[in-house]
Amino acid sequence: QDYEKKKKVPAVLDIHGGPRTVYGEVFFHEMQVWVSRGYAVMFTNIPGSDGRGDEFADLRGKYGTIDYDALMAFTDAVLAKYKKIDPDRLCETGGSYGGFMTNWIITHTDRFCCAASQRSIANWVSMAFISDIGPMFCPDQCDAQSLYGDESTRRMWERSPLRYAENCKTPTLFIHSDEDYRCPLPEGMQMMQALCANNVETRLVIFHGENHDLSRSGKPLNRIGRLKEITGWFDRHTGI
């Protein structure tokens, strides 16, 4: 959209996956699409990201704590610096770990007017038994000793967004692929059902024949469809 100096703009907080990946100075077409429609785009490398050493990147047992705090502080800092951003029209999205973080945010604050959670983690306990890396990855990331036992289950459940879903008030779109074995479809379904039970506006979009890499190497029409779903959800809730 044409820039208008006095007009406030909505913004998208985009959270990378991993968590041990990193945003760099590269062209990212999704951000360009949103900017072209009149959004500001916010992104940063929070604790858990690569690029600042192993201690900074080690998020085991701390999911939803220092990373969440860093994202909220970052959002506050952006809003303080860029007064053109409308704090009442903030959107958030992310995939994989970014999807986990999207789920965590919507269950811990209602500062975002809408969210799009992609290929996400909702429940570490269920994911431990259905993900292709679940038996190893989930206990390790939740600082649990094994798949089994009350203490391990407690630790995984404590770090699960689904546990806190009754707090969610944010209209949320869930996107999953039915051949995603990393963050399987039931993770998004659980969150969607929890929001429905609490009368929160939600939508689940399933891409058939796609996997965890839909956004990167999916069929072209499905990649376009995915971005249209996300952007349309944002447009609807920000009034663009």
Where would I find each of the regions flagged by the language model?
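Short beta-strand-to-loop junctions in surface cap/lid or active-site-entrance loops
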Residues: 1-7, 160-162
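Short beta-strand element of the alpha/beta-hydrolase
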Residues: 6-17
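Active-site-proximal cap/loop segments of hydrolase catalytic domains
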Residues: 43-240
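Short amphipathic alpha-helix adjacent to the substrate-entry channel of hydrolases
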Residues: 25-44
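A short, aliphatic-rich alpha-helical micro-motif
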Residues: 6, 34, 165-168
